[in-house]
UniProtKB/Swiss-Prot annotation:
Source species, domain of life: Bacteria
Species name: Burkholderia orbicola (strain MC0-3)
Alphabetical UniProt keywords: Cytoplasm, Hydrolase
Protein name from the UniProt record: Urease subunit gamma
One GO MF term attached to the UniProt entry: nickel cation binding
Gene3D superfamilies per the UniProt record, alphabetical: Urease, gamma-like subunit
């Protein structure tokens, strides 16, 4: 299977997000990379599902709370940017303060 660097990045994000999902389901608090992967993958899937950029940006602030992550993680993530594939093309999505 031949994948572009972008496709490899997407698979890596998905794999890390799947691990984060499983750990969260077991009641573990997510660390920095897990929180980033969890939110990023959810944003990419929301875009793929046909949500608008504004809807995806808002959705990104509802995925995790401070109780879901280790101490200090929310302060380490002032914003998340991801290039997501929407029905009308690829767009840059920025979510400010994704963990309120």
């Amino acid at each position: 299977m031949k994948l572009t660097p972008r496709e490899k990045d997407k698979l890596l994000i998905f794999t890390a997000a799947l691990l984060a999902e499983r750990r969260r389901a077991r009641g573990l608090k997510l660390n920095y990379p897990e929180a980033i992967a969890f939110i990023t993958a959810a944003l990419m899937e929301a875009a793929r599902d046909g949500k608008t950029v504004a809807e995806v940006m808002h959705y990104g602030t509802t995925l995790l709370t401070r109780d879901d992550v280790m101490d200090g993680v929310p302060e380490m993530i002032p914003d998340i940017q991801v290039e997501a594939t929407f029905p009308d093309g690829t767009k840059l999505v920025t979510v400010h303060h994704p963990i309120p």
